[in-house]
């Protein structure tokens, strides 16, 4: 927009030397850019809508006060932005610390789970060598999975808890099953297991 020439009288009455320039007042500077090596400012003109804003070269402007104020404000904003970028916020530091702590805890837990469990010594008495290849007693048994028991291979007193080593059909590994479950699911097989291991003694009386 810059400066416009206003000719209130006709050109016939006024010569070129007498042409008068009417300067438009700058309300505020909105933005700044460098184009082809020259600094230009995006101006809001006083008394005109935003749609009339224009880019004007610095050397065409006569509003040094507004330019100085805008440049000072722009430098302050740049310093503030640089300061925030260089120094992360306390919340970001806290999240980073928390993340490291969580990672350390996770690593420690993983290492602990990978460590072999120490042997329990002679707390449990094993009656057969087949227990070396057994599935330990857990919350679920082969019965819970719908398997059919084929044979009781042995029994074990595990910390005062009687368990049976049961071979299920279609499964390679035998499984330790609590006696309470076996007594309910396969009572006849349990009785047969005991009968096979009973020794009968008779006293010969003269």
Curated annotation (Swiss-Prot):
Keywords: Chromatin regulator, Chromosome, Nucleus, Phosphoprotein, Repeat, Repressor, Telomere, Transcription, Transcription regulation. Residues 1-24, 47-145 are annotated as: Disordered. InterPro entries: Chromo-like_dom_sf (IPR016197), Chromo/chromo_shadow_dom (IPR000953), Chromo_dom_subgr (IPR017984), Chromo_domain (IPR023780), Chromo_shadow_dom (IPR008251), Chromodomain_CS (IPR023779), Heterochromatin_chromo-domain (IPR051219). Salivary gland (at protein level). It holds the Pfam family Chromo_shadow. Disulfide bonds: none annotated. GO terms for biological process: chromosome organization; heterochromatin formation; mitotic cell cycle; negative regulation of DNA-templated transcription; pericentric heterochromatin formation; positive regulation of DNA-templated transcription; positive regulation of FACT complex assembly; positive regulation of transcription by RNA polymerase II. Residues 72-98 have a biased composition (Basic and acidic residues). The keyword Transcription applies. Residues 95-206 are annotated as: Binds to Su(var)39. Residues 50-60 have a biased composition (Low complexity). Residues 24-82, 147-205 form the Chromo domain. One of its GO terms (molecular function) is chromatin binding. SUPFAM superfamilies: Chromo domain-like (SSF54160). The keyword Kinase does not apply. Transmembrane segments: none annotated. Structural component of heterochromatin, involved in gene repression and the modification of position-effect-variegation. Recognizes and binds histone H3 tails methylated at 'Lys-9', leading to epigenetic repression. Stabilizes chromatin-associated RNAs probably by binding to them and thereby preventing their degradation. Associates with, and may be a part of, the HipHop-HOAP complex that recruits the MTV complex to form the terminin telomere-capping complex, which binds to chromosome ends in a sequence-independent manner and prevents telomere fusion. Homodimer. Probably associates with Su(var)3-9. Interacts with Mcm10. Interacts (via chromoshadow domain) with piwi (via N-terminal region). Interacts with Rrp6. Associates with and may be part of the HipHop-HOAP telomere capping complex but is not required for its stability or telomere localization. Interacts (via the chromo domain 2 (chromoshadow domain) and the hinge region between chromo domains 1 and 2) with cav/HOAP (via C-terminus); the interaction is direct. Each molecule of cav/HOAP interacts with 2 molecules of Su(var)205/HP1. Interacts with HipHop (via N-terminus). This is Heterochromatin protein 1. The lineage of its organism: Eukaryota, Metazoa, Ecdysozoa, Arthropoda, Hexapoda.
């Amino acid at each position: 927009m810059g400066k416009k020439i206003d000719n209130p009288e006709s050109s016939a009455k006024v010569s070129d030397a007498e042409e008068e320039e009417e300067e438009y007042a700058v309300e505020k500077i909105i933005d700044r850019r460098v184009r082809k090596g020259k600094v230009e400012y995006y101006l809001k003109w006083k008394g005109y809508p935003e749609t009339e804003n224009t880019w004007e070269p610095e050397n065409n402007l006569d509003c040094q006060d507004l330019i100085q104020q805008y440049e000072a404000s722009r430098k302050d904003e740049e310093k503030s932005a640089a300061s925030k970028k260089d120094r992360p916020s306390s919340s970001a530091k806290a999240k980073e610390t928390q993340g490291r702590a969580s990672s350390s805890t996770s690593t420690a837990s993983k290492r602990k789970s990978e460590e072999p469990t120490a042997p329990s010594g002679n707390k449990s008495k094993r009656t057969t060598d087949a227990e070396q290849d057994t599935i330990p007693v857990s919350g679920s048994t082969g019965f819970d999975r719908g398997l059919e028991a084929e044979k009781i291979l042995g029994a074990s007193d595990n910390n005062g808890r009687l368990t049976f080593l049961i071979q299920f059909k279609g499964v390679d590994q035998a499984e330790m099953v609590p006696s309470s479950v076996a007594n309910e699911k396969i009572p006849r097989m349990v009785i047969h297991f005991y009968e096979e291991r009973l020794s009968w003694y008779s006293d010969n009386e003269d």
